[in-house]
């Protein structure tokens, strides 16, 4: 284990270091510190790994104890690739994770990441058009959707339909 991977055992959801996972609403997460420095929560090892590969900056990780060995190589790659300082890895019992989420956490891992800067719509669309080359472009626009389950389903459907970009 590298020095920059800081594993911290958690025994209570009252721990202030877990605020992003336990006590903050989606709106509060968007506005943590300043709007441009908000955070978002990623759920599952697969989603976390994709976020890391996409270059999102992790704030912390929270996982069930049985996931630590599986996730440690990802944490170590992140530290080596990014040269990041210590990123806390909070480890809790699976029972505590279930208490947090209200259900059996089969995917066992959560992560808080810094939100990327919001880019202007025209800049986003320009990038989508450029990436598409000569073929027609398909963009999905989400307006007023607040349920993360619906948003996740829409993103998965958009990926299956080869949508080029999603405006949220």
Regions found by a protein language model. Give the residues of each.
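Phosphate/diphosphate ligand-binding glycine-rich loop within oxidoreductases
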Residues: 66-105
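A generic local structural motif
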Residues: 27, 48-49, 97-98, 153-155
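RNA substrate-binding interface of SAM-dependent RNA methyltransferases
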Residues: 5-8, 46, 53, 81-86, ...
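Broad gene-expression machinery/nucleic-acid interaction feature
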Residues: 108
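Glycine-rich phosphate-binding loops that contact phosphosugars or nucleotide phosphates
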Residues: 111
């Amino acid at each position: 284990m590298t020095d920059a991977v800081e594993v911290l055992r958690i025994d209570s959801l009252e721990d202030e270091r877990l605020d992003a996972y336990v006590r903050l609403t989606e709106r509060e997460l968007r506005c943590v510190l300043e709007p441009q420095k908000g955070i978002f929560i990623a759920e599952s090892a697969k989603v976390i790994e994709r976020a890391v590969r996409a270059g999102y900056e992790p704030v912390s990780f929270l996982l069930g104890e049985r996931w630590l060995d599986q996730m440690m190589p990802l944490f170590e790659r992140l530290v080596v690739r990014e040269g990041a300082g210590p990123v806390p890895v909070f480890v809790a019992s699976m029972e505590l994770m279930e208490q947090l989420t209200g259900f059996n956490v089969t995917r066992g891992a959560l992560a808080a990441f810094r939100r990327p800067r919001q880019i202007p719509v025209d800049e986003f669309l320009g990038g989508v058009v450029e990436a598409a080359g000569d073929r027609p472009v398909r963009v999905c626009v989400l307006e007023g959707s607040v349920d993360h389950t619906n948003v996740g389903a829409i993103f998965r459907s958009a990926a299956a339909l080869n949508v080029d970009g999603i405006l949220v």
